[in-house]
Each structure stands twice: as structure tokens, then as C-alpha cells.
A protein has these predicted regions:
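Acidic/glycine-enriched connector segments
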Residues: 11-177
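Extreme N-terminal starter segment of soluble prokaryotic enzymes
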Residues: 1-4
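Glycine-rich beta-strand-to-loop/alpha-helix junction loops that act as flexible
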Residues: 7-9
């Protein structure tokens, strides 16, 4: 069964009409949605799904509690490593890895700056899962399905963002069971 991981930048707090239409198609097809608990895109998606009275939603949270669950949906608290007491990028990316593992496709809302959103695209691509990225400043959807698509998508990123993504990818790979696609960076 298709499960959609919807996520995005914390700086995106409102959904454009184009994004709402994509989510409406997900709702029409009755596809389960996996969404995080962060402010920004996660919360905006939650609020839109709640406004549509959509029930096939699961909210993923790192650690013991969720920051946002506007629809009162089932929550999945994802255990963090014992050294994960600091609520930093690594702490919150725990739930993102779980959603990328479980989802079959992704819809990411990107502001051209968020490292976390780009990392979610990479996580999904490493699992050979299609991702549709909405590039908010350009009001454009980009399909990322292959390594070539990933390279083209990455070429849109500023050099400092590429460096941060490369660093986070190495940290994540060293902490996870070995991925065979380090060449994606």
C-alpha cells in the first residue's frame, strides 16, 4: 500500500494552492499520510489535513512527546539514541529516518534553504522511493526518482547547503547500518 511522507521546511508556514491540490489528490485516493510534528510545513500540513477531516494520518515524533498534533491523530514516538538528550538536528532527524523507511513515496515542501528537507529527499532516494519536491520560492514541483534526478536537484542548492548536507549525510551513515549509496553526494 502506498504511504506518503509529507514534510518540509520549518520556514514554510502556509500551503500554496498548488500544494493543497496535491494533498487533495492524496486525500481523494485515501492514501495514508506520515507527517512530522515540527512547526512550519509539518504543522501547516497537519492543519490542512484537519480542515479536510482526513483520518488516515500518523504523526511521528522524536522522543517521548509530540510538539504538534493538530488533528488528534495516532502518534508514533520514535525512540532516540541514549545519547540523544539534546534536542538538536540529530534528535529530530530520528523521526524523519523512520518516516522515510516506512513511506513508499514522499512530498517535500522546500524553501531552498532547509538542510532537513534535502536530507529527507536523500533518505527517500537512497531507498529507491520517488519524491516530489515543491520548491516554494519558484512555485514549482520537481520529481526526484533516480540518482541523475538527485544530482540535478542538488545542483539547485547553494554550495554551503551542499556542504551541510554532505556533512549530515556522513554523520548519519556512520550512525546507521551502512548505506551503499554514499556516491549520491
Amino acid at each position: 500500500m502506498t504511504k506518503v511522507f509529507i514534510g518540509g521546511s520549518r520556514r514554510i508556514s502556509r500551503l500554496d494552492a498548488e500544494v493543497k491540490r496535491r494533498i487533495d489528490r492524496i486525500i481523494e485516493k485515501r492514501l495514508p499520510v506520515l507527517v512530522g510534528d515540527a512547526n512550519g510545513a509539518d504543522k501547516a500540513v497537519q492543519e490542512y489535513l484537519r480542515s479536510k477531516s482526513y483520518d488516515l494520518v500518523e504523526v511521528f515524533c522524536s522522543g517521548d512527546s509530540c510538539r504538534n498534533n493538530t488533528g488528534g491523530w495516532p502518534m508514533r514516538t520514535v525512540p532516540v539514541p541514549k545519547n540523544g538528550k539534546r534536542k538538536d538536528f540529530s534528535f529530530y532527524s530520528t523521526k524523519d529516518r523512520a518516516m522515510a523507511d516506512e513511506a513508499t513515496v514522499g512530498l517535500m515542501l522546500w524553501d531552498r534553504e532547509s538542510v532537513g528537507t534535502v536530507m529527507n529527499v536523500l533518505r527517500l532516494i537512497r531507498h529507491q522511493k520517488k519524491v516530489v519536491v515543491y520548491v516554494a520560492p519558484d512555485h514549482e514541483f520537481v520529481d526526484v526518482k533516480t540518482e541523475g534526478d538527485w544530482e540535478q536537484f542538488l545542483s539547485r542548492c547553494a554550495d554551503d547547503l551542499k556542504e551541510r548536507v554532505a556533512k549530515e549525510s556522513v554523520v548519519e551513515q556512520n550512525g546507521e547500518r551502512g548505506s551503499t549509496q554514499a556516491s549520491l553526494l
